[in-house]
């Protein structure tokens, strides 16, 4: 008898898993991830929340476009907002794919919003 493959996670279950990962983070990563989630969803509502390597991520058509890495989980001095190769951020032959995050001010939020909108286009 053939083994059944596990069912693919639904968009709803992936969204719940992403929210659970954020809720389980210690501060200040939780506050930053919560704010980033709201910012990403406002800037690119077509992206779907999910997890990727155990961290919150945002996908277009099932492919991760951007993701958050907790400073505490990775034992770094800053959190990271990263973009995958599916992000539409290409600028010539060289462009950044990750950004260090120590604090989210209005200026950073505006820059992140513009980057996410472009990445998801």
Where are the regions a protein language model picked out?
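Charge-dense, helix-prone N-terminal extensions
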Residues: 1-121
């Amino acid at each position: 008898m053939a083994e059944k493959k596990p069912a693919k996670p639904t968009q709803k279950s992936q969204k719940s898993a992403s929210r659970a990962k954020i809720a389980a983070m210690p501060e200040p990563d939780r506050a930053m991830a919560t704010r980033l989630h709201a910012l990403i969803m406002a800037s690119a509502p077509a992206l779907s929340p999910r997890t990727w390597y155990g961290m919150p991520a945002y996908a277009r058509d099932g492919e991760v476009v951007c993701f958050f890495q907790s400073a505490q989980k990775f034992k770094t001095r800053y959190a990271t907002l990263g973009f995958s190769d599916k992000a539409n951020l290409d600028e010539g032959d060289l462009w950044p794919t990750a950004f260090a995050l120590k604090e989210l001010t209005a200026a950073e939020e505006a820059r992140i919003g513009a980057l996410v909108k472009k990445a998801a286009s």
